[in-house]
Amino acid sequence: MDDLENIIFNSVEEEIIYWKSVAMKYKQCSEEAQQELQEFQEASREYEAELEAQLQQTEGRNRDIFSENNRLRMELDSIKEKYEEQHSENYIQISTLEGDLSTTKAVRDQLQKYIRELEQANDDLERAKRATIMSLEDFEQRLNQAIERNAFLESELDEKENVLESVQRLKDEARDLRQELAVQQKQEKPKSNMVSPETERMDTSVQASIAIPLAPLTPLSQRGCASTLNSPLSFKTSWDDGYSGTPLTPCARISALNIVGDLLRKVGALESKLASCRNFVHEQSPNRPLTSVSARMNKTREGIENRLSIASGSSVEKGLIKRLEFGSLPSNTPMQGMRSPQGVVKIII
């Protein structure tokens, strides 16, 4: 407008032409603006329609999204509740498992300690077992030796009984011989009133041997009259001759009495040996049950008796031959009874 006011026209026509051109120019501008406005309105209507459509779509999507959001919120709340419940349950379970774990660890430690103690006790028991086995073997060995010793002593005891029977028989025979000697002396007294010094010495020796049977005597091999009694059978024959009425020589009578004294001494020695062996057995096995020992001794005794019952021959003569060693047996005497019972070990005391 300042430019238009500053314009100076030369004439009115120039001014009119100028203003007409300006008016045409503005008119054209207004038409263009109107056209642009119409185009803009049409475009804006189109945009508005599009925007409304988009708005409707967006609102629909928003409604869907909102409903979905509400559903998801509800699901989230339910999941949170479930999570809290599960978390509480898991917490309780974890606390319970932790308590169980601590208890299990304590039990495991106790069991490991108990296992170690059991292993130590097992080792101790194995050592004690080995020691017990060794002591048991030693004890069984000693017990077997004692049983064998007892079996041998029982056989010795049986022989002792046989010897005692023989001694008793010999005592009876000696008594009969003394009576017979007294009768013969009474018969010979009227014939000879004077007794020789040699006969007195013999009678004195006979009486001394009868009064003291256990006195130490010289062996049979050193006696002067041993030649007449070199075997039990000849000794028995001499006694039979005495019973038949044939007078015996004083030397034979003295030898018979000496044999009786030897028998008595050996019987006493056997009794002392038996007592010492019994004491030895009691000292060696004080804690052994008596039933098992007695059972085994009874079995051994039965076996020995069975084996001894099989042997043939006179037990008295065999006991005399075995224990007293009078002399060699005659050829017709069986040697089966002289053998030791099988399984019996002779122990020198």
From Swiss-Prot:
It is found in: Cytoplasm, Cytoskeleton; Cytoplasm, Cytoskeleton, Microtubule organizing center, Centrosome; Cytoplasm, Cytoskeleton, Spindle; Chromosome, Centromere, Kinetochore. GO terms for biological process: cell division; cell migration; centrosome duplication; centrosome localization; chromosome segregation; establishment of chromosome localization; establishment of mitotic spindle orientation; microtubule nucleation. The keyword Hydrolase does not apply. GO terms for molecular function: microtubule binding. Its main location: cytoplasm. GO terms for cellular component: centrosome; cleavage furrow; cytoplasm; cytoplasmic vesicle membrane; kinesin complex; kinetochore; microtubule; spindle pole centrosome. Keywords: Cell cycle, Cell division, Centromere, Chromosome, Coiled coil, Cytoplasm, Cytoplasmic vesicle, Cytoskeleton, Kinetochore, Membrane, Microtubule, Mitosis, Phosphoprotein. Required for centrosome duplication and formation and function of the mitotic spindle. Self-associates. Interacts with pafah1b1. This is Nuclear distribution protein nudE homolog 1-B.
